[in-house]
Swiss-Prot record:
Protein name, entry field: Small ribosomal subunit protein eS4
Lineage, broadest ranks: Eukaryota, Sar, Rhizaria, Cercozoa, Chlorarachniophyceae
HAMAP family: Ribosomal_eS4
Keyword RNA-binding on entry: yes
Family: Belongs to the eukaryotic ribosomal protein eS4 family.
Pfam family, one: Ribosomal_S4e
Keyword Kinase: no
Gene name per UniProt: RPS4
Length: 242
């Protein structure tokens, strides 16, 4: 007889997006289903314990979440298992503190404090476009948002700056030469680079030639990149990151 999906997660088999102290215990908080995959995200409970230091153990961290004073992407979050990943925002309105989840230079998830003006803004990558009718199209982003548009200027691999409260598209970032990108996968995870050339191969895959801030060059696939700005300038504040 089938046992169904496992409801536990061991520390030794957890993803490597943040560093876990694997000798302090056997089990880790299992991420619930949500907008991010378990490979690229961590639970809200681990974020509270590791980065905000609001709790010493899991029981205290769960109580912090249940108070209802914590917002994720502009919406109240009451689940300590909620998946948190790249570009998500975490807010504490009572303390007037707002943070964004980014990749450190070591390729691990970390949080940086942001201004109040950016607390409801997020960069999402377009992964699929569906033709709903002759004029309207449905855009699916990397965090599983479905956005309806009536123009065809947006393409797959582009990025969108959206308001998380009402899913309004504020600005579209094109995937083209000169765009500023964040590498989200592979050896250079967490590195910022500029697109210098987009070359098609015989297998119809696009190989992207990039140049880092220090002048070093590298090559990546389209799926490994997230456009975050234009003309070497990020559309969101990354002063602590760069």
């Amino acid at each position: 007889m089938a046992k169904g999906i496992k409801k536990h997660q061991k520390r030794i088999s957890s993803n490597t997006m943040i560093k876990y102290k694997k000798k302090l215990g056997i089990f880790n908080t299992k991420i619930s289903s949500g907008p991010h995959s378990k490979v690229k995200s961590v639970s809200l409970l681990n974020i509270i314990k590791k980065f905000f230091h609001l709790a010493d153990n899991n029981q205290e961290a769960q109580k912090v979440v249940k108070t209802g004073f914590l917002y994720v992407n502009g919406k109240k979050c009451l689940s300590h298992k909620f998946p948190i990943s790249l570009m998500d925002t975490i807010s504490f309105p009572l303390a007037n503190k707002h943070y964004r989840v980014l990749l450190s230079k070591a390729g691990k998830l970390t949080v940086y404090e942001i201004n109040q003006n950016e607390k409801d803004l997020k960069i999402c990558k377009v992964i699929k476009i569906i033709n709903a009718s002759s004029k309207n199209k449905i855009i699916i982003t990397d965090d599983l948002r479905e956005l309806k548009i009536n123009y065809a200027k947006i393409k797959v691999e582009d990025s969108l700056l959206i308001k998380t409260i009402n899913d309004e598209i504020v600005y579209a970032l094109k995937f083209e030469v000169g765009s500023l990108c964040l590498i989200t996968r592979g050896k250079h995870l967490g590195t910022i680079a500029v697109i210098k050339e987009i070359r098609k191969t015989k297998s119809l895959r696009k190989m992207i030639h990039l140049e880092k801030i220090d002048g070093k060059k590298l090559t990546k696939k389209c799926s490994d990149l997230l456009v975050i700005g234009e003309s070497k300038t990020s559309i969101l504040s990354l002063k602590h990151y760069i």
